[in-house]
Curated annotation (Swiss-Prot):
The gene is metI. Pfam families: BPD_transp_1 (PF00528). PANTHER family: ABC TRANSPORTER PERMEASE, D-METHIONINE TRANSPORT SYSTEM PERMEASE PROTEIN METI. InterPro entries: AA_ABC_Transporter_Permease, MetI-like, MetI-like_sf. The keyword Mitochondrion does not apply. One of its GO terms (biological process) is D-methionine transmembrane transport. It is a multi-pass membrane protein. This is D-methionine transport system permease protein MetI. Part of the binding-protein-dependent transport system for D-methionine and the toxic methionine analog alpha-methyl-methionine. Probably responsible for the translocation of the substrate across the membrane. Residues 41-57, 102-151, 207-217 are cytoplasmic. Keywords: Amino-acid transport, Cell inner membrane, Cell membrane, Membrane, Transmembrane, Transmembrane helix, Transport. It comes from Escherichia coli O157:H7. Gene3D superfamilies: MetI-like. Residues 1-19, 79-80, 173-185 are periplasmic.
Length: 217
């Protein structure tokens, strides 16, 4: 493999990591409060509101049901408005965030559902407000589950970013598609696959370590 190709792969790794972690961050900025809202408005929860729950749940389900490659193409006009272009690293972050947010919201809701109801009832009996319950009971107790959700999300985004590479998003996906598939270069394709596997392994390893650390606390 030539030296220019090796440097191209290094840049591809950096672009893939940037797309994954930046979109993961913004996905959590949107998905975490939506997931908390889904939980607290469920029937029987601290601010139960069946109509609001059904509405938010329906919106989340709609966006979760759209395959990412279709979402990527569908959002091209919207992406152009936000970042001024529909190709490249910055453009990819927009649909990646939109694709991740509803996925995160559901995982946050599921993590909160694992919390024993006795803890919530005890907090309510002591006069805690809904916001205090969320901040001091729900989120701390669900922290291991939230870290696990973040790990799964980042791994999913690695795959999404690779798909985005096929339409000019950059990263390892674009290198694999352009030089491996279109250019009939099996060495490049196999190298891209190995690098993606390594990235996923490292993210999973780090996530597992963090989960163990916060669980001990």
């Amino acid at each position: 493999m030539s030296e220019p190709m090796m440097w191209l792969l290094v840049r591809g790794v950096w672009e893939t990591l940037a797309m994954t972690f930046v979109s993961g961050f913004f996905g959590f900025v949107v998905g975490l409060p939506v997931g908390v809202l889904l939980y607290v408005t469920r029937p029987g929860q601290i601010i139960a509101n069946a109509k609001l729950y059904r509405t938010v749940s329906a919106i989340v389900n709609i966006f979760r049901s759209i395959p990412f490659i279709i979402l990527l193409v569908w959002m091209i006009p919207f992406t152009r408005v936000i970042v001024g272009t529909s190709i490249g690293l910055q453009a990819a972050i927009v649909p990646l965030t939109v694709g991740a947010a509803p996925f995160i919201a559901r995982m946050v809701e599921n993590a909160l559902l694992e919390i024993p109801t006795g803890l919530i009832e005890a907090s309510r009996a002591m006069g805690a407000t809904p916001m205090q319950i969320v901040r001091k009971v729900l989120l701390p107790e669900a922290l291991p589950g939230l870290v696990n959700a973040a790990t799964i999300t980042l791994i999913t985004l690695v795959g999404y970013s690779a798909m985005g590479g096929a339409v000019g998003a950059g990263g390892l996906g674009q290198i694999g598609y352009q030089y491996g598939y279109i250019g009939y270069n099996a060495t490049v394709m196999n190298t891209v696959l190995v690098l993606l596997v390594i990235l996923v392994y490292l993210i999973q390893f780090a996530g597992d370590r963090i989960v163990r650390a916060v669980t001990r606390k």
